[in-house]
């Protein structure tokens, strides 16, 4: 991730990209060291290492992420990103890049990943 996310919207797009590419390295760069991710119903993990571990488990089940911010409220270096099925708190670091501090991704917000349009698979 060259230079990181320059806006909260960019951060959402980069998270979607990390899911599509299934890149643990890219995923880790999007979260603060002590970040919290809540996904897969009520599963809560803390820190970059645990977040990457959970993401890899989600990828094994062909889960993806769709960036669809509905509203962004920003106060200085902190922003709240509201999506249809979740909410994320993000902060701009000293390097100017935005990172997730808290990410709440509901089960509905994590669609199964399409795999070559095989019959019987849902989008």
Model regions: which residues?
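A beta-strand edge to alpha-helix "cap/lid" segment located at domain peripheries
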Residues: 1-26, 36-123
């Amino acid at each position: 991730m060259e230079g990181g996310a320059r806006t909260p919207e960019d951060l959402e797009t980069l998270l979607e990209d990390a899911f599509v590419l299934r890149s643990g390295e890219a995923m880790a760069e999007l979260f603060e060291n002590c970040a919290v991710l809540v996904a897969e119903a009520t599963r809560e993990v803390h820190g970059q290492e645990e977040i990457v571990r959970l993401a890899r488990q989600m990828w094994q089940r062909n889960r993806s992420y769709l960036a669809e911010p509905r509203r962004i409220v920003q106060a200085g270096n902190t922003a709240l990103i509201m999506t249809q099925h979740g909410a994320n708190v993000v902060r701009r670091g000293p390097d100017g890049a935005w990172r997730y501090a808290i990410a709440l991704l509901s089960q509905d917000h994590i669609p199964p990943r399409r795999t070559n349009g095989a019959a019987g698979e849902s989008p």
